[in-house]
Each structure stands twice: as structure tokens, then as C-alpha cells.
Amino acid sequence: MDILSKKKFTEINSGKFGITKKIVRKIFKKSILNSTIKGKQLIHSFPINFYIDNKKITDKPIGQICEKFGISCFNLMVDRFCFEALDNCYKKKKISVKGFFDSGVASSISSLTNSEKNQGSVCIDIGSSSSKVVVYLKNKIVYVANIPIGGNDVTLDISKGLEISPESAELAKIIYGTLNLPFNEKIEIDLDSNEKKLISKNLLYGIIKPRYEEILEIIRDNLFDNLYARIGINSIVLTGGASKIFGLENLSEHIFNRKSRIGRIERPDSFFHNKPEFSTLLGLIELAKNYNKYDFATEYLNNKFLTIYDRVENWIEDSYA
């Protein structure tokens, strides 16, 4: 499902008695209601900055005195037809969906540290058919993209290059795949016919590395077209199933000219330790645990005013208590 990201600026008259939590609630609700686009469904709305009389930018508006009070939000939207079709699939099975979340945002929440989010980092989740890119700057999401290229493209290259099935190619990629030049040793690849194919490991390397270079270069070019992303990024965190290949950190540092690491759970006793393919799942768990914090836009747009009021209230209390 394609993601549309769009910044939205909203402004209200605040009077001359100082900004209160009530005014913050008012402007954020107005921002959500004014963010509707025909044919699109809003799934996330992240506050970026508050504006005092169109000049001063602040993260802490409570108590500030001004006549005009503004807010800029970073909104994520999806195609409404696809959204409703997916929602109806669950309803037919009598499954009630509490909320929809962007998988790239979920991966970034589980993979990035608070320090990385503050200093400026990008989380790149390389999946099977797409790569999800999320940029944080000063603890705020400033860029999101979903690029239709991923690990399956590598598998298909191997399948065509070695004239083997995609299943055998995927297995060869997992077992023998590397982005560092290997010794010119011979390896055996299991075929579907219970036979084996003997090839040079260098041949496999020669197929895999160019495709990974292309994937990262496409991501880099899309990323650096955005001024915030190009200037603010200090580090790269790679996650997703296709990030497990040996040597990806070094290749990423070469292409992005930024410090790179593979996203992982730091607890060695955890089942998810060194398993970046579970980053989206772990992020979704975190999102579900903090549902009030991350998702109130959808229910507000569906006219569930009491619920959204409570959620915005919780967000304001947590942020500006």
C-alpha cells in the first residue's frame, strides 16, 4: 500500500492570555480535521513544531503569550479504497481492527535508540518486496517513504543468473550470501530435484553485491532529495529480513557516508536478539502498548469524538504536564 506523506500547517487565534492545554487540544484537533484529502485515509499525524505569531518555533508552547498560535504536523496517508478493502476483509471474519500503523514507523520505534532519534537517524527496513525509510530529527519524524525494491529482487537475480528456482536461490542467498569479497571457493547449491549444483562463491557474490548496491543507492537518492533528511542524518540503522546479509553495514557506510549498524534487540537472552527481521512485529507491539500516544487521528476522522478527546488529552498530559 503506497504511503503519502504531507506536512500540514494549522493556525488559530489564541487571544492574549497565554497558551493553555485547552488551546493545544483545540489546534491539534483542527489540524486533524483539516488534513483530509479526497481518496486518502489519514493513519498517522505527528506534531513537529508549534509557532508563536508566525515567528517563534517552540516545543513547549504552554504559557506563551501570542495572538496567533500555529502547529505543523507530519501526516501519513494511504489510499482510502485499499484501506477500506483491507478493513472489510477483517470485518467479514468478524475481526475488529483497533488501528492501522505504518510498518516502517513500527520498525523505527523498535530499532532506533532515543539518542539516535534525537541526533538524526534514518531507519531503513529492507523487506522482501519493499524498503521502508523513516527519518527522525530531534525526536520527530520528518520523512517517510516506501520504495518498491527489496530482498526478493536479489533472489530473482540469483535465480536467473544461476538458472535455478527462486526457492533454491533464496536458500543460497541465506546460507552463502555475502557483500564482502569471499575466497574463490566452491559451494554446493541444493536444487529442487534433490540434486546439487556446484558453483564458485565469487559468482554468487558477483550477483548479490550489485543488486544490494542498487537498492541502497536508490534509497539514498530518494532520501537525499529531502533537505531535512540530507542535512539532519548522522547515522543509518538497517533492519528487516534482507539486512541480515554479511557485510551490509560496511556497504551502507560506503554509500551513505554515514555510520551504519544493524538494528537489534540488545538483550542477549531475548529470543529476538540479532533478529532484525522481527523489527516490525516488535514495533507494532510497542505501538499497541502505547496506543493512546501514537494513534488518535483515525478515530477522530471516524467521528468517535469522545475517544479521540481522551486520547488527545492523554497525549497533552504526557507531553506538557
Over which residues does each language-model region extend?
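Short, solvent-exposed amphipathic alpha-helical segments in soluble enzyme
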Residues: 116, 224, 251-257
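A conserved active-site cap/scaffold subdomain adjacent to cofactor or substrate pockets
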Residues: 148-170
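Glycine-rich phosphate-binding loops at beta-strand->alpha-helix junctions
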Residues: 177-180, 231-255
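Phosphate/pyrophosphate-binding loops at sites that engage ATP/ADP/AMP, CoA/4′-phosphopantetheine
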Residues: 216, 220-235
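Nucleotide/phosphate-binding catalytic cleft detector across ATP-hydrolyzing
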Residues: 1-121, 142, 165-166, 177-208, ...
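Gly/Thr-rich phosphate-binding beta-strand-loop-beta motif of the actin/hexokinase/Hsp70
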Residues: 1, 112-144, 158, 284
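Residue-level signature of catalytic and energy-coupling elements of molecular machines
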Residues: 90, 158, 219, 238, ...
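Conserved phosphate-binding/catalytic loops in two-lobed NTP-binding clefts
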Residues: 255-282
